[in-house]
């Protein structure tokens, strides 16, 4: 039911040329300590309870972006969880849109970007562009990675007919 409702909503909004953000991906079911909690979950429960609606929406409605959750999932923060962001979302579900952090959730921006994030929402101190520039200068970020992230962000605007 959740997947069907969200799919219809996202398709309707995006038909007007307005981008959408599907959130909070994934296993975000509490507000208490949501920035520090660690959701320990087995694969079957993850797939059947927490990911099934996301999968339906991603595959059918193709939202402009997916927002990663604050919490840790099996020890790794949502915004840098390679398994969820790259292996499941990108490779398995073939998602092409943007993957964005929640506000202030990119607590290791280089690791977040390398593990599947494409856009950071800032924390109270702002964006971490200096950290990314330094990582590029010292070779921790490659030209290909930078090109892929930039292409992804620009494709979102093109998909909405904004450029």
Predicted regions mapped to residue ranges:
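Glycoside hydrolase catalytic-domain context in secreted enzymes
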Residues: 1-163
């Amino acid at each position: 039911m959740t997947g069907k409702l969200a799919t219809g909503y996202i398709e309707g909004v995006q038909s007007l040329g307005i981008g959408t953000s599907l959130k909070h991906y994934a296993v975000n079911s509490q507000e208490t300590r949501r920035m520090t909690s660690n959701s320990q979950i087995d694969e079957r429960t993850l797939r059947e309870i927490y990911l099934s609606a996301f999968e339906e929406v991603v595959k059918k409605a193709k939202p402009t972006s997916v927002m990663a959750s604050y919490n840790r999932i099996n020890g790794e923060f949502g915004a840098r969880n390679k398994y969820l962001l790259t292996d499941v979302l990108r490779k398995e579900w073939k998602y092409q849109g943007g993957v964005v952090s929640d506000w202030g959730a990119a607590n290791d921006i280089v690791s977040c970007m390398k593990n599947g994030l494409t856009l950071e929402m800032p924390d109270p101190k702002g964006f971490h562009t200096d950290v990314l520039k330094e990582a590029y200068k010292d070779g921790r970020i490659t030209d290909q990675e930078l090109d892929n992230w930039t292409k992804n962000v620009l494709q979102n605007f093109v998909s909405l007919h904004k450029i």
